[in-house]
């Protein structure tokens, strides 16, 4: 008599396939996360209230960049493309040589991760979905705000530079550092974010803003 049910066997096969895919992502990724060349930016001097207002009005963007996740015994490096339209988004995560990729599409209350046209998974939050399917702890809901250089709704502690750029933030158990900004049109936007939460460290590079 088999000690593993059909459902358990199917679940093990799915997890095994995901593990293989993640291994491909790790092998094909770069060994270091390189920063884009520093462009010359003329920063805008504003009050924090005005800067927050301008940044909070940005609700559509196309971003491409790279990120790394460091946790005990494992380091993940990958590239990404993030398309945002209002509260709807589509994020493609892929290896440097495009050997492996996943697509995440979401709207409030519904997030789907696609590993192939026929293989997809759903959850109510992106954090839940990525933890279940990829084993990653990424505060994607809050990153919607943090990548614009503003806090997410809720309590926070923050530090600012002389231009009132957000340079350090503590929120929802995360410590975030904004080490570079770049001028895009009439606003200054982050280029690098460093996040930490206990033993977990995440670095996000935003190479191009549109």
Curated annotation (Swiss-Prot):
Membrane topology: Lipid-anchor
UniProt keyword terms in alphabetical order: Cell outer membrane, Chaperone, Lipoprotein, Membrane, Palmitate, Protein transport, Signal, Transport
Pfam families the UniProt entry points to: LolB
Signal peptide: 1-29
CDD domains: LolB (cd16326)
Matching InterPro entries: LolA/LolB/LppX, OM_lipoprot_LolB
GO cellular component annotations of the record: cell outer membrane
Record's keyword annotation contains Signal: yes
Chief localisation class: membrane
Lipid-acceptor residues (S-diacylglycerol cysteine): 30
Subcellular location, record wording: Cell outer membrane
Residues with a covalently attached lipid (N-palmitoyl cysteine): 30
Entry-linked HAMAP family: LolB
Role played: Plays a critical role in the incorporation of lipoproteins in the outer membrane after they are released by the LolA protein.
Subunit structure: Monomer.
Protein family according to the UniProt entry: Belongs to the LolB family.
Protein's name in the database: Outer-membrane lipoprotein LolB
Organism whose genome encodes this protein: Coxiella burnetii (strain CbuK_Q154) (Coxiella burnetii (strain Q154))
């Amino acid at each position: 008599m088999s000690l593993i049910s059909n459902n358990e066997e199917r679940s093990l096969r799915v997890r095994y396939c995901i593990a293989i895919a993640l291994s491909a992502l790790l092998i094909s990724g770069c060994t270091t996360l390189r920063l884009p060349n520093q462009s010359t930016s003329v920063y805008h001097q504003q009050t924090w209230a005005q800067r927050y207002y301008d940044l909070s009005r940005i609700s559509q963007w196309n971003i491409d960049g790279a990120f790394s996740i460091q946790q005990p015994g494992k380091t993940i490096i990958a590239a990404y493309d993030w398309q945002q339209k209002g509260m709807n988004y589509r994020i493609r995560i892929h290896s440097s040589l495009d050997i492996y990729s996943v697509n995440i599409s979401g709207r409030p209350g519904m997030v789907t991760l696609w590993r192939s046209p026929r293989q997809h998974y759903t959850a109510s939050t992106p954090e839940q979905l990525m933890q279940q399917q990829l084993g990653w702890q990424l505060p994607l809901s809050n990153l919607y705000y943090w990548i614009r250089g503003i806090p997410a709704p809720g309590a926070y502690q923050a530090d600012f530079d002389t231009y009132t750029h957000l340079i350090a933030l503590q929120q929802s158990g995360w410590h975030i550092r904004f080490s570079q900004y770049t001028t895009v049109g009439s606003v200054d936007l982050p280029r690098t974010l460093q996040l930490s939460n206990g033993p977990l460290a995440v670095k996000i590079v935003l190479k191009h803003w549109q």
